[in-house]
Swiss-Prot record:
It comes from Cutibacterium acnes (strain DSM 16379 / KPA171202) (Propionibacterium acnes). PROSITE patterns: FTHFS_1, FTHFS_2. The gene is fhs. The lineage of its organism: Bacteria, Bacillati, Actinomycetota, Actinomycetes, Propionibacteriales. SUPFAM superfamilies: P-loop containing nucleoside triphosphate hydrolases. This is Formate--tetrahydrofolate ligase. One of its GO terms (biological process) is tetrahydrofolate interconversion. ATP binds at residues 65-72. Coiled coil: none annotated.
């Protein structure tokens, strides 16, 4: 089979105006960025308000291996498969971060004959949204340090400042830094650091904002630290929010691209799935829901991560109710959850893992069953989509089917990587069938619940924990947040994506464990409280041999080695 890059280059790209027309978007709403990409004006949301009758389907997954299980690829294949059976679809995806693109994971444009095009633009700068997020974020950081240097009129306590700087590259050397070194004219020395841009609260705000005015208001509510009276200091207090909004004005508009079979794709925002909300934008979904029979929207990592935040946060803010959820599974992930194999990024799979062994599949099935249960807990119909690899065996595929159907889920195997939309026709039919059953959608918690109650409900109802253990400092901070009026915020639990628990070594569906909450923070602009459980890093590092070593450019200006 040809490489992803070869397939992407050989694919026929329709003019973006034609792709927009296929989605019912008039050319007057487009701002083209070359032949294959366009920004979509926000007026489309108003124009489509009376036509918002498409089915709303979230694409999530079982707990993945470190390699990922092909969720984006499956979402692309499904969009193409729906077109094959005469159902118009629009796909909404997050924009990939350049950090993982140059790291081990590589890009996030799909694979094989189920890719988003132009692939190179998508995996790199696209229309510059991430640069705008970084610029707005770092402008606020600069204004904080300038305020300290100019006399600190707001009486900010420097040690309370939580607003770090960001860059869209994996760079562990920047995790902890000291700024303001030099002479007195170079600022006030203090410890700080860098996060990756995908971890920025500004990026989360972009993904959750429902309008330009909402974006502006959320930016103003960002809390960067506290004054010496322990009162929050906001971006509005620093007079930074207006300039930040100006930088982000165009970034608020979704980006229109296409699949290898020319189906429309809206790519917008890219907050991380383990430490942030992990979903594409509310605005992109509002655009897409009025443009097709089915809107497919991808949520990061497993159903315990991005999908939980999709249901409890994104759907609340967007005011939309999902009709079904696609759970992507793989034979290799099921075998990993049997606890008998170790998958290491950058290394080949263990040879024994590729042998025909349905017993190993069944031994890891508890994880898939738990994710089906999670989706059903939200009152939504689950469809297990088995992303088939060439090394999978028929009786292993049949074992997955039996597990899924016994747990009350629809099931379809899919060969979309090799066969494009034709390989996802069965999956498309399964999604249509699931959407025919009216969902009884419900949230995990009420916003009126206390913050502790919300965290407990997510831990017990979604993850399967027996309860939560809150560190004394975290408990004190939660009480402080309640006093500040943040008690009605939804919650995000920042934890590993490699386990249903906080411990990446616990595979399957762990029982008899409690979730330790060691720290809590407030993302006031985005509008949620997040609890940190386990060792979570907001700035990744590069591996021994990152993908960046293999990427180059030839004499004709063609990229080499991007995947």
């Amino acid at each position: 089979m040809k490489s992803d890059l070869e397939i992407a280059r050989e694919a026929h790209l329709d003019p973006i105006e034609k792709v927009a027309a296929r989605a019912g978007i008039d050319e007057k709403y487009l701002e083209p960025y070359g032949r294959g990409v366009a920004k979509v004006d926000l007026d489309v949301v108003t124009h489509n308000r009376d036509h918002s009758c498409g089915k709303y389907v979230v694409v999530t997954a079982m707990t993945p291996t470190p390699l990922g299980e092909g969720k984006t690829t499956t979402a692309v294949g499904l969009a193409q498969g729906l077109e094959k059976i005469g159902k118009h679809s629009v796909l909404a995806l997050r924009q990939p971060s350049m950090g993982p693109t140059f790291g081990i994971k590589g890009g996030a444009a799909g694979a094989g004959y189920s890719q988003v095009l132009p692939m190179e633009k998508l995996n790199l700068h696209l229309t510059g949204d991430f640069h705008a997020i970084g610029a707005a974020h770092n402008l606020l950081a600069a204004m904080i340090d300038n305020h300290l240097h100019q006399g600190n009129e707001l009486d900010i306590e420097p040690h309370s400042i939580s607003w770090r700087r960001v860059v869209d590259i994996n760079d562990r050397a920047l995790r902890n830094t000291i700024v303001g070194l030099g002479s007195r004219v170079d600022g006030v020395p203090r410890e700080t650091g860098f996060d990756i841009t995908a971890a920025s609260e500004v990026g989360v705000i972009l993904s959750l904002a429902t309008s330009l005015s909402d974006l502006r208001a959320r930016l103003g509510r960002i809390v960067i630290g506290y004054n010496r009276s322990k009162e929050p200091v906001s971006a509005e207090d620093l007079h930074a929010a207006g300039s930040m909004a100006v930088i982000l004005k165009d970034a608020l508009k979704p980006n229109l691209l296409q699949t290898t079979e020319n189906s429309p794709v809206l790519v917008h925002a890219g907050p991380f799935g383990n430490i942030a909300t992990g979903n594409s934008s509310v605005i992109a979904d509002r655009v897409g829901i009025g443009c097709g029979d089915y809107l497919l929207t991808e949520a990061g990592f497993g159903a315990d991560m991005g999908a939980e935040r999709f249901f409890n946060i994104k759907c609340r803010i967007g005011g939309m109710r999902p009709d079904a959820a696609v759970l992507v599974a793989t034979v290799r992930a099921l075998k990993t959850h049997a606890g008998r194999y170790k998958v290491i990024p950058g290394k080949p799979l263990p040879p024994a893992m590729l042998e025909d062994n349905p017993d190993d599949v069944l031994a890891g099935a508890a994880n898939l069953r738990k994710h089906i249960e999670i989706v059903r807990e939200f009152g939504v119909s689950p469809i297990v989509a088995l992303n088939v690899f060439p090394t999978d065996h028929p009786d292993e595929i049949d074992a997955v089917r039996k597990v899924a159907e016994a747990a009350g889920a629809h099931f379809a195997s899919s060969t979309h990587v090799v066969d494009g939309g034709d390989g996802a026709v069965d999956l498309a039919h399964a999604v249509v069938a699931a959407c025919d059953h009216k969902a009884d959608f419900r949230y995990t918690y009420d916003l009126e619940d206390s913050l502790v109650e919300k965290l407990t409900k997510v831990a017990t109802k979604v993850y399967g924990a027996d309860g939560i253990d809150i560190a004394p400092a975290a408990a004190k901070e939660l009480a402080h947040f309640e006093d500040l009026g943040y008690g009605t915020f939804p919650v995000v639990i920042a934890k590993t994506h490699l386990s249903l628990s906080h411990d990446p070594s616990l595979k399957g569906a762990p029982t008899g464990w409690r979730l330790p909450v060691r720290e809590v923070r407030a993302a006031v602009g985005a509008g949620y409280i997040y609890a940190i459980c386990g060792d979570m890093r907001t700035m990744p590092g590069l591996g021994r041999h990152p993908a960046a070593e293999r990427i180059d450019i030839d004499d004709n200006g063609e990229t080499i080695g991007l995947f």
